[in-house]
Amino acid sequence: MTFTKFFTRGLMVGAASVALSLAANADFAEATKGLEFKDGLVSTYVDHAKARVLLALDKPDENGIAGRYIYAAYLTGGLGSNPVGLDRSVPAGGEIIAFRRMGNKVVAMVENHNFRATADSTAERRAVETSFAQSIIWSGDIMEEDAETGRLLVDFSSFLTRDAVGVAARLKGRGEGSFSLVKDRSLVDTKAAFMFPENGEFDAYVTFATDKPGREVRQTTPVPEAVTLIAHTTLIKLPDAGYQTRLYDDRAALIGMTYVDMSAPLAGDTVVRLARRFRLEKDENGKVKNPIKFYIDNGAPEPIRGALLEGGMWWADAFAAAGYPGGYTVEVLPEGVHPLDARYNVVNWVHRATRGWSYGAAVSDPRTGEVLRGVVLLGSLRVRQDIKIFEALAGAEKTGTGAADDPVELALARIRQLSAHEIGHALGFAHNMGASTYDERASVMDYPAPDVRANEDGTLDFSHAYGVGIGTWDKWTAKFLYGDYNGKPDAEAQAELIREADAHGHLYVSDPDSRSVSTGHARGAVWDTGSDPLASLENTLKVRRIALDRFGMDNLRDGEALTALQTKIVPLYLYHRYQLDAAAKSLGGMDFVYRHEGDGRPAPTVVPWERQEKALSLILETLSPEALDVKDEVLMTLSPLGYSDGDPQFGREAFDGAGRPAFDLMQAASSAAALSFDALLAPERLVRLDAQGDASAEHPGLGFVLSRTSNSLMDFSKGEDATQQGLRELVASLYAERLIGLTFGEDVAPAVRLETRAALMGLKAKAEKLKRSNAHFASGLIARIGDAMARARTPAVKEPAAATVPPGSPIGSELGEACWHCDTGTE
């Protein structure tokens, strides 16, 4: 071939390539023509006319990766149902997502950082990566490719309208129906597509349909067959390598993350635990570079907004104690800011049809635990329930007075605590359920019960109801999590801090050792108060009795329907429920701390029997007719529940009862007794009592506890009136049912079954002696026990079906026990 021919052919090929390139670029330009361009983390084109969002992804690398980001999904618009839990602002995700080219498509792949190799060997890291699954959660066609820059244009809309937070599964799992995503009714909200230098934010309306919606959906949705929520997608720039990880330590109340390092030395641990925390650094002059800043939802009304701001600011003292004065602050969210914008750590004020839980959470880097965004959800109806509780205690005439016993002021004090508590979770702090027992409430990360005190003159003192400010434990944990270790290895610096905590007398009790009524740490409980759980229960019972005896018209606001008394009496009648649980932890309980080899911390000890016996006496006091009775004049004020069509809270806050429309005292007593028996007869507690009796002559053991209980409940020699005798019969019958359930229950320890069987036979013998004086009750109890013994496999029955306990906690859910002032985010 001559040079001329070769050169001519080269010109022709080059011209063709240029033409193709120009055509490709023209196609790319044509595809984005007229669309709104948003520059930032990812080049974005918004098509308002067709409700589309297009992404121009960077040129793929040699592995086909066109971008890697932190990905999180939320709901901008929720369902508004606490039992279902599809609330606005609760984050899902926090994974690293990679957009990868595969042929003519781009896939979104969630990387697996739970298993990794930190070794330098590429082959070793690759071996781990290919040993565990990843997750492709979306794919989209490549619309155009920019020949000049290599950028890929993809329609991101179907990613944004996916069921990213698992709405259908959640609705089905909560018994609300089999819902399916309706694609033609799920559209991107192009007016809520935002792109910033380090994050992108997108909203989309997503609709789920069914032909059989459940109760909660019917209550909260205008057309229950079509549930439309607003899904939110966040993409965040991967953090740089400057973040310093911090080791997690189970002796401090931290929120951690875990991964498995397959390249760990053979003599080392493959499981690596890191603490989650914000990046907090100082410049060369020792000043904080980028303070942690939280924002209060501007949708929260005053005076609630001010209380949230004030409580949130308490953490500033903890950061100052950690060596970072000015390292933390709180402001009100500016107008016009999307509450899910990743640039802002937001305390969201969220409404539901019924009262519910609050949460503190975070979006973090799964590689390091670095918190990139704090997210707090506060349920708005909680404050109203708190007011109801305090109106039952103090009287409604105190509302709005501004005095120490003003229910509104008391509820706002609780809101300050709630703000600090949930922000604490977002900062990386876990619960310390032992903090209520020392240093006048050592932490905002405990669950605070109101410290209302009974005076000798029959009045109530509300001046100590809630603490103010951050606690001593919080300052110590702030040093542990955020303080500078000055070049010391984490393990060494943390060991020094643990010694400091021990010298001070700090106590940490974790969620698993506190939350359930059956747990065994004597000072680990929720919604308790006071340094001595037993003395606090005595005080709580006095407060309850004082308020119950004067309960009536003074507990109503002007013009309020008398029906309201039936809901206000519930938290008052059950006012002792959580302090009862706290006191019961001493029965069969232990005192212990979390220990590491060589740290010199003390070994566990069993609670002395004299304290256990006092706890037993107090529990039995809560089951006495005197404790369960209500004055006749109080009962007469409890007007029948009226009809309230459409009120989702109506009825659920009152005692159920076969005696309606009259107030059913026996049903209320059944509910209270159920709580006492839950505490006394928790199977785990019975196992510990039996073991302690076997191990030491100083502890009489389970048999003694059951015998003492039987003697107390079956004591009909006190000359009680007809109502109180009926209450005694009720409680004794409920006790028999519990013993039957324990004796023939499948999951009960054999040693416990033997003891409860003996107690059941003893109860029958006591009933035999009552035949002459109380034939009807005695005969019925004997027959019930005899029938259970004859069948030998009677299904466990905790209490009669009517003995439902009204919700105490926001609503009581799988997250934990029922309580009136609940908040958890670690949860």
Language model features: what each stretch is:
Residues 26-300, 318, 333-385, 390-407, ...:
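Auxiliary tRNA-acceptor-end handling modules of aminoacyl-tRNA synthetases
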Residues 65, 298, 302-310, 409-418, ...:
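Soluble non-cytosolic domains of exported or imported proteins
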Residues 62, 301-327:
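Zn2+-dependent metallopeptidase catalytic core
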Residues 2-12:
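Bacterial N-terminal signal peptides that target proteins for export
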Residues 332-350, 413-468:
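The catalytic-center signature of Zn2+-dependent metalloproteases
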Residues 436, 440-827:
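Conserved catalytic/binding loops enriched for acidic/polar residues
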Residues 313-324, 424-425, 429, 450, ...:
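Sec-exported extracytoplasmic/periplasmic mature domains
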Residues 10-21:
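Bacterial N-terminal signal peptides
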